Amino acid sequence: MRPTVILTCAAAAHAQIFGNFFNQMLKKEFAVEESWHNQEYHKVSCDNGHVCPDTLTCVNSPLECPCQFPASEIKCVYPDKSGYVCISKPGDGYDGSDASSKAEDGKRDCAWVNKAFRGEL
């Protein structure tokens, strides 16, 4: 019985050391990316406008911000115009950006986003 307890404790200690090592590495990597993004954000010259946080694009208002990956995302503006969300385009080629279209079951498009916004899902 004692060897089982010793092996269990050793395995737990090893897992904790291993987990801590990678957790510290991830924290450092994220801090570097965040620091770089903040530096780039502050470099953007945008007089009398708004800098989009995801794309660092200068626009007149936050609702004009483009999606970060326009080839694979569609931008859906909330019904009350308080913001927007970029979602993956449906795989069938339909761009799904028409918020007035009828939301089809299982299809994630702007009509679906509007239903979710209103709490109808």
Curated annotation (Swiss-Prot):
Keywords: Signal
Record's keyword annotation contains Translocase: no
Cited InterPro entries: LCL2 (IPR034543)
Signal peptide stretch: 1-15
The keyword Cell wall biogenesis/degradation is assigned to this record: no
Role this protein plays: Probable component of the endoplasmic reticulum-associated degradation (ERAD) pathway.
Family assignment from sequence similarity: Belongs to the LCL2 family.
PANTHER family linked: LONG CHRONOLOGICAL LIFESPAN PROTEIN 2
Protein name (record): Long chronological lifespan protein 2
Organism in which the protein naturally occurs: Yarrowia lipolytica (strain CLIB 122 / E 150) (Yeast)
Lineage: Eukaryota, Fungi, Dikarya, Ascomycota, Saccharomycotina
